[in-house]
Amino acid sequence: MADKACVQRLQKEFKALSREPVPHVVAKPSPSDILEWHFVLEGSEGTPFQGGFYYGKLKFPPDYPFKPPGISMITPNGRFATHKKICMSMSDFHPESWNPMWSVSRLLLQTPVPRAQTAYMGVKKMDNAPTTGSINSTVEEKQLLAKQSLACNVKSATFRKLFPELVDKHNELLRLAKEEVERAAAEAAAKAAAPGTSKSGSEGGSQNSVRSRSKGRKTEESTAGGGGQQRNDAVHAR
């Protein structure tokens, strides 16, 4: 059970975080456990994590802030294994380096997020520097996981409850994707129909032109033949 001082400190930090949010990060304590915080990190532009939304957890000890929290990622990201603690200087892997003056906001800024200003996700060099909890993956694999991240997150009931705005974003992206598919299908159908109609009309026009020229030649031949017969009749009459 959390100490009274721990609960008060975390409540105070949540209020401070609500007033001054960390850019591209959303964090909320669990409604049933103040020691468990859930966060979502947005991937930065120009990185393999662009477009991704990475869901993770902070697990605070009962005597926080005198001891650091544990940090884990839930969303598959290609940089860290899911549901396993991540090793970093501000986590419970290194309690000797922890400073009780550090806040949750600072912790989130230093969390191994998929953003350009941190080296933990291997963004700057696009590498896979090994550390406890890390995994290896290609840039392409990270990009694919980024595209799939929201769809993966909304499967979690806790995520849906804590971050309804991101669920709405996911639904909006699905709607836009559906409209794009329907629009592309309609354009393809229109293009397929247009050449067929034009070709049919062209062929019909060509056939009519051929028939007209053929009819004209027959008329000319008939006229020419009639004139020859009249000349022959005139010769016999003389």
Identify the residue ranges that each predicted region occupies.
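Short, surface-exposed, charged/polar-biased interaction segments
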Residues: 31, 35, 92, 109, ...
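Charge-rich (especially acidic), low-complexity segments
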Residues: 116-238
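Acidic, Ser/Thr-rich intrinsically disordered and amphipathic helical segments
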Residues: 9, 36, 103-110, 158
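Alpha-helical recognition domains of nuclear gene-regulatory proteins
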Residues: 13-17, 57-59, 107-110, 114, ...
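Histidine-centered catalytic/metal-coordination loop motif
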Residues: 65-133
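Strand-helix-loop interaction patch of compact alpha/beta domains
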Residues: 1-86, 95-99
